[in-house]
UniProtKB/Swiss-Prot annotation:
The gene is fusA1. GO terms for cellular component: cytoplasm. It comes from the Bacteria. This is Elongation factor G 1. Keywords: Cytoplasm, Elongation factor, GTP-binding, Nucleotide-binding, Protein biosynthesis. Signal peptide: none annotated. Its main location: cytoplasm. Belongs to the TRAFAC class translation factor GTPase superfamily. Classic translation factor GTPase family. EF-G/EF-2 subfamily.
Amino acid sequence: MSKDLSKVRNIGISAHIDSGKTTLTERILFYTDRIHAIHEVRGKDGVGAKMDSMELEKERGITIQSAATFCNWKGTDINIIDTPGHVDFTVEVERALRVLDGAVLVLCSVGGVQSQSITVNRQMTRYNVPRIAFINKCDRTGANPAKVTGQLQEKLQLNAHMMQMPIGLEGDLVGMVDLVTMKAVYYEGENGDEIRITDIPAEMLDEATEKRETLLEEISMFSEELMEALLEDSENVDIDLIYKAVRQGTIALEFTPVFMGSAYKNKGVQALLDAVETYLPCPTDVENIGLDLDNEETEFAVTNNDEDPLIMLAFKLEDGRYGQLTYVRTYQGQLTKGDTVYNRRTGRKVKIGRLCRMHSDEMEEIDGVGSGDIVALFGVDCASGDTFTNDAVNCSMTSMHVPEPVISLSIKPIDNKAQINMSKALNRFTKEDPTFRTFVDHETNETIISGMGELHLEVYVERMKREYAAEVEVGKPQVSYRETITQRAEFNYTHKKQTGGTGQFGRVAGYMEPLDEGDYEFVDKIVGGAIPREFISSCDKGFQKSLVKGHLCGAGITGVRCVINDGSFHAVDSSDVAFQIASVGAFKDGYMKAKPVIMEPIMKVSVEGPSEFQGAVMGSINQRRGMIIGSNEEGTYSVIEAEVPLSEMFGYSTTLRSLTQGKAEFTMEFANFKPVPKTVGDNLIKAHEEERKNG
């Protein structure tokens, strides 16, 4: 079961939507003999790309779930996670990056570094993922890989350098110049699988020599051996020294090699596969950190050793045609069919029935797996982000960063059968996607779903219908507002109830103040036993209950520190419940004195389209209470960056289409919360009061 980990690569393919990422994965599977025919993403043959296995994905031509697949290139096992490019699905990208050792950042040679490329790059940086860049679509009109490499340096602050030069561009693209071997590589034959290597065309030699000198100078910083070799004889440097230096720089996150081609036209993909094998790290090159649960979550380095106790992380759940699949990454130790492992979050024992490698939605059963690998398990009940170990170790892998949802919808099943199916669907979706939340609003008795954007929720409503036959009526999208306080305020509240028998008594006093970071903090400054120790946590519970619904517009309260410094109790009548009720009253007493305000989610919006529509687009953003934070023009194309309240963005795609004749597109992601203007706040308060009267 043990395998040579230097021959394993766990990689992700991440990009902006429509950069040709799924097409690239499709070609990789073809060249590594995993599939024997090529299908396009929006293919006329009705098959769709291999990695887009959900019906919804084939229809929309976007990748929603990050399918994991396995292939082998020249003796190296490669696990590929194909991640969604749409900003509403960023949690899928984050989850994939958490378990990967390296990544390929795919860019469009015309669009260059777009808004989602910036988001993905930021996520890669957060998880210290070494990356190589692939500039795709070099066959398109306006292709300019040199310009895109410049954008990688300027916009993403990456030390990016071209490892190749295109031979011909746009419709004339026939191959690449390899700047390491100084050879011309042509991709011929119907599927680009006949590779011809020749000398560099004479007219390109000077430029190639110059670019190679720059490249060698840059990477010599990562290898003393290479630096010495260059000083001795820069014309005849050992190629292996170059490969080694690029690898060292890439793994240290100090260098980003740039490759190029056209996946659609079958050019440059094999060189990218060589680069994955040569430059991206194997599991032992990367340090993964675990938290020791027996020692106050002290960090420790995971070993990648098969002989050590098992540690693995569930990073994705899927309900496919084979039942529930749990994708796991093994960090150390071995797992064999029939083993019993422990879910460290729930404390439950789990018996492993079947193990398999997934190839998009087809599977290949295996008997066991060693450290550093990615596999799928059957029938394991868990949530995404759970850590599994054997009984010799009690630890957790660091939890993943999960953004807060910003948009909500009410959904109502059309009949009883739909109600039952909807419950099943929601139970599964919340387990597999931590940014998808659901709750029942007891005042209106409606089921509310929350997520990262309109498309995110649309996809789940659609999946309910398709996968669970749960027909639901969908309400209008609702913005997730928040309430917070702006100044310190004292509170002092006594709860007293006497109705025969044991009564209730509790007094809570102290103050609340704005909290700069975080949602809520409880501080106990009680001295001299004014409130007995056993009731301190009751006060905390009461305050937390108060945060659920604010007094202005009914939104959740955030950014509050509650400090208790006095109180009183009764030897007989004081209880847990009495102090919880007293704390709720104390919170109410202080809240309105603390000058509360309503906060709304602000989105970072990026609009890309022809420059001729720039004025109209800016006007449409200003009308939506937006603030333009930057714009730049590149030829006939312009990109406008703005911050706009989410409540103003509903239906914007329709507006933008009609303003720009369908030629512009926009992406948005959550930026921050800001106080609403007075008029908007007054309307929200009024609407909330009306609702309460009618409710």
